[in-house]
Amino acid sequence: MSKSGPLARAKWSLLLLVLAACATAPSSRAPAGPGDPRDGLTAAQLDRFQRGKAVFERVFTPATGLGPLWNNVSCVACHDRPAPGGSGFESDDIEIHASRFDSTATPACNELTADGGPVFHVNATSGTPPRIPPSANLGVGRRTTSPLFGLGLIDLVPDAAILARQGTLGGRAHRLPDGRIGRFGRKASRATLQEFSLEAFVAEMGIEIPTELSAEDGQLTVDFVRFLALPRRREDAAGAKLFAQVGCDGCHVPRLADQPLYTDLLLHDLGPNFQDMCRGQARPTEFRTAPLIGVRLLERFLHDGRAASVGEAIRLHGGQAEDVVRRFERLSPDERQRVIHFVEGL
């Protein structure tokens, strides 16, 4: 036998080991980025995700159903940062909402539907859009475009998990007129992702389903949002500990029914700094705890974008969050920065 025989056999053995490892090793797919589909989808679900994305990016015109009142010409025109399904902070991404609140009336919240509310559009295919009527007890609110990443997980939370947390820091579920629990929207005014997503076609673009957009295209858009991945988060055990220590996790619950949402999906009274408009049973100072999803991708903070930083957003919290803010302020400067750094990484 030649001297090269054992060496050749060793090389072949090494090659076979490498090939076996490649064949049996789990996929090393990179973590999902903003706008990517979540892991574990079937081929059929991935197909619906891609087809839904195409509808999400479709530009509408008056000839294809836009109007007569509208805020923008496509879903992605507002939800575009840093990818389709993201947030928006340009002037044309800001909505104006208005309603009238009177605690002595029944119902207490008048959403001004007879006047074109509660969403007052900035564009009309002809003439001028309705203006907010002058009125006593009027609340006007600005709304930035919130990201849609990971919203499909909210649909997976059972009502019982939301109701079980009622009373924690004064939170309460938003019971809708039909008895269901609201969970979507800044005031938790919609019960399902289906309703929340399809309503946007009418509220933002004046597009009626199924007369101006097919029911199938509407459902594809819902599935696109449902299958959007939760953006990856930065690991920070020390920051997470301080986040819990000051009590932020009392409302921004890290896992609700095992979904990593950082919300309790309850309404909380956040004090006069947050007062603007009512919606359904939600009073002007009450807001659903915002899920802390994709915070690192945001440019402005809070429902109206007034906060330029996470620290400013924390300090504007009042009402049922006052004690939490006080504990945050009692931290050392380094500890406060650690909490901010943690939230910025979510």
Can you describe what each PLM-predicted range is?
Residues 11-21:
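Bacterial N-terminal signal peptides
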Residues 2-13:
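Bacterial N-terminal signal peptides that target proteins for export
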Residues 22-346:
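Periplasmic c-type cytochrome electron-transfer domains
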